[in-house]
């Protein structure tokens, strides 16, 4: 498996896992949340379910990897480059356009999750990590990063991860997820035994 960086760069580069393991790494803890998390609440007849059933499409892990900015600096980004196409090697060929500004900020090429190599189902040997962005854009089994002038409008950005607006147009690239919070106790299906004072608790994340 290799990672190719090409497009609007001065030096196209190819990295193996062994190559990347020699680079300085960064470790951080953060959430990955599915773009469809809590989506059941937007239906005309919202689903009646537990907190986990309604809001559970997220996870929190410690990720370790090479800052993407390090690799892009080594490749030498052309001044015309404003976006980066990230492509996975999965059967669906998942591909998403990422603003270059985000790639140069806090993006990681993640090699480890919770202190061990990223597992196959999580994108082994490497995946893209974009803190604060919707889950699908954190491309697994990453094989290619192409620096481009604008977004590519891949099938995953036109047929799936776009939002149909009331006027019939589609809104694209609403990539960042805002802060969210939910009440976890009492949860759906629970009943308080009698009138009185009860503690309400929950979690918040961003």
State each model region's role.
Residues 1-206:
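Structured, non-membrane catalytic/scaffold regions adjacent to prosthetic-group chemistry
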């Amino acid at each position: 498996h290799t990672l190719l960086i090409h497009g609007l760069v001065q030096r196209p580069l190819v990295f193996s896992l062994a190559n990347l393991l020699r680079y300085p790494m960064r470790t951080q803890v953060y959430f990955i949340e599915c773009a469809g998390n809590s989506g059941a609440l937007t239906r005309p007849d919202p689903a009646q379910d537990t907190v986990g059933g309604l809001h559970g499409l997220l996870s929190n892990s410690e990720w370790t990897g090479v800052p993407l900015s390090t690799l892009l600096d080594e490749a030498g980004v052309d001044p015309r480059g404003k976006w980066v196409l990230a492509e996975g090697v999965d059967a669906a060929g998942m591909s998403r356009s990422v603003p270059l500004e985000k790639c140069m900020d806090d993006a990681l090429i993640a090699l480890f999750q919770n202190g061990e190599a990223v597992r196959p189902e999580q994108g082994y040997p490497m995946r893209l990590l974009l803190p604060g962005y919707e889950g699908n854009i954190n491309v697994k089994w990453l094989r290619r990063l192409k620096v481009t002038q604008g977004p590519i409008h891949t099938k995953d950005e036109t047929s799936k991860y776009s939002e149909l607006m009331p006027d019939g147009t589609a809104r694209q690239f609403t990539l960042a997820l805002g802060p969210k919070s939910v009440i976890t106790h009492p949860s759906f299906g629970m009943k308080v035994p009698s009138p009185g004072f009860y503690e309400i608790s929950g979690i918040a994340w961003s």
